[in-house]
Structure formats: C-alpha cells, structure tokens
Amino acid sequence: MVAAVARLWWRGLLGASALTRGAGRPSVLLLPVRRESAGADTRPTVRPRNDVAHQQLSAFGEYVAEILPKYVQQVQVSCFNELEVCIHPDGVIPVLTFLRDHTNAQFKSLVDLTAVDVPTRQNRFEIVYNLLSLRFNSRIRVKTYTDELTPIESAVSVFKAANWYEREIWDMFGVFFANHPDLRRILTDYGFEGHPFRKDFPLSGYVELRYDDEVKRVVAEPVELAQEFRKFDLNSPWEAFPVYRQPPESLKLEAGDKKPDAK
C-alpha cells in the first residue's frame, strides 16, 4: 500500500514538473497504435497513412519543442508516421537523454546512426539518429548538423550502441565526435587516406592494392589510369551479336517524316 502511494506521488511530481517546463502545456503521452493484420490478397505494398498516429506524433513533437526550446529548431512528421526533430549540435546529449528517460517517450533503443554529405550547404554533414520506443511502438528521427572541422558530442554516454556507429561515420565521412572512448577507423585499412563517403572523394580513390609476386605480399601503389577520358560511343569487341544492332534508318521517325523506301 505504501509503495503504491509512493508511486502515485512520484508520477504526480513528474507530471507537475513537465507541466512547468512545458510553459503551461499538459503532458503528451504516446499511445501504442495497433495495426490490424490484413489478408494476403488485400495487404498494401506501402505503409498506409495513419491519421491518428500522425496527429499524436505531431502533438508529441510540439511538446518536446516546448520543453527543450533551446535545442529543438524544427519538428515535422513524415508521410510514413515518423517524427523528425531537427536540433542544434549543442543539444545532442540533452535531447537524446530526454527522449530516452522521459516517461512519455522511452526511446531506449538506438536503431541506427548515420550521416549525409551535402557539399552545397555551409554545414555539409547531417547527422541522423534513429530511435525506437518499444514501450509505445514508435520511432523518432533526430537530426543535427556540422562541418568538416566542428566536432559533435559523442552519444556513447547515452547509448552504448553509438560507439561503432560513430566510428563508422568518422571513417567514412570524417566527422569528429568529441569524448568518444575509442574513435578510430573501423572499415578501411590501416593508413588509409581520406573518407570514402564524402562527395568530393575521387571515384577511383588515391591508391590501389595488389599482390606483388616479387615481394610476396600486398602492396599499395598510387592509382594510374591508362586512359583518363573514355568515350563509350563505339562497337564493343565483346558484343555477342553486332550484326543484329538496329540500323539508323529503322530508328523512330519524327512526326511528319516519311518512311524511307525499302531497297
């Protein structure tokens, strides 16, 4: 009995504190949305729009923005009922901690962490955190941004799963994560130069690896292209049926042209 009263008192205290932080807005609770299974012949090929879930996620996004106005810059719900929250880079730890620990959120699983390179932007890298709430069967996508030189605070202190994800982003994109316990390359080889997923990284790379029969080991050499510019408008010597290639005369005629007489 005493434990039940204590739990009720603690929930009331949390609700009061959330109400105070939300500037008078009542707490918004994510409710699990049940999806009824359809038959094999009527099952849609794409996920249908759920208006109830869409309104609920939109209200929860506004609730998060009012509680954390210092960090949340934009909130939107995608067509597939996924909430996207765009935050300032300084708000990575506070926002992720709030979404993980808040009673009405409980996004305790970091499903994926990746980056997007858009060179035309001033802050060319977009860092994307995909979170999952098993309690409410809901997903949320947290986005932030940075450039080549500005580090992002590591999320390992909030989600242990971010360790290797951040190492992969550092290896592929060159985004530095501050306070990471072991930030080093994870996919490329030792001594690799550059970051392959950057849009300005050359398609051929900088070095090529091959096995040298003389030294009996794998060696790395600068890339040497025998032909810098290649024109592909030619007959391939490996073409199996060159005689069956469509002649220019039988190509599609323009409107008003007459068909040439057959010889």
Swiss-Prot record:
InterPro entries with a match to the protein in the record: NADH_DH_suC, NADH_quin_OxRdtase_su_C/D-like, NADH_UbQ_OxRdtase_30kDa_su, NADH_UbQ_OxRdtase_CS
Membrane-topology descriptor: Peripheral membrane protein
GO biological process, one term: mitochondrial electron transport, NADH to ubiquinone
GO molecular function, one term: NADH dehydrogenase (ubiquinone) activity
This protein's record includes keyword NAD: yes
Transit peptide: 1-35
Chief location of this protein within or outside the cell: mitochondrion
EC numbers for this chain: 7.1.1.2
Cellular-component GO terms for this entry: mitochondrial inner membrane; mitochondrial membrane; respiratory chain complex I
Keywords from the named record: Electron transport, Membrane, Mitochondrion, Mitochondrion inner membrane, NAD, Oxidoreductase, Respiratory chain, Transit peptide, Translocase, Transport, Ubiquinone
Catalyzed reactions: a ubiquinone + NADH + 5 H(+)(in) = a ubiquinol + NAD(+) + 4 H(+)(out)
Annotated compartments: Mitochondrion inner membrane
UniProt keyword annotation of Transport present: yes
Role according to the record: Core subunit of the mitochondrial membrane respiratory chain NADH dehydrogenase (Complex I) which catalyzes electron transfer from NADH through the respiratory chain, using ubiquinone as an electron acceptor. Essential for the catalytic activity and assembly of complex I.
Family statement: Belongs to the complex I 30 kDa subunit family.
Record's subunit section: Core subunit of respiratory chain NADH dehydrogenase (Complex I) which is composed of 45 different subunits. Interacts with NDUFAF3. Interacts with RAB5IF. Found in subcomplexes containing subunits NDUFS2, MT-ND1 and NDUFA13.
Protein name, entry field: NADH dehydrogenase [ubiquinone] iron-sulfur protein 3, mitochondrial
Source species: Pongo pygmaeus (Bornean orangutan)
Gene, per the UniProt record: NDUFS3
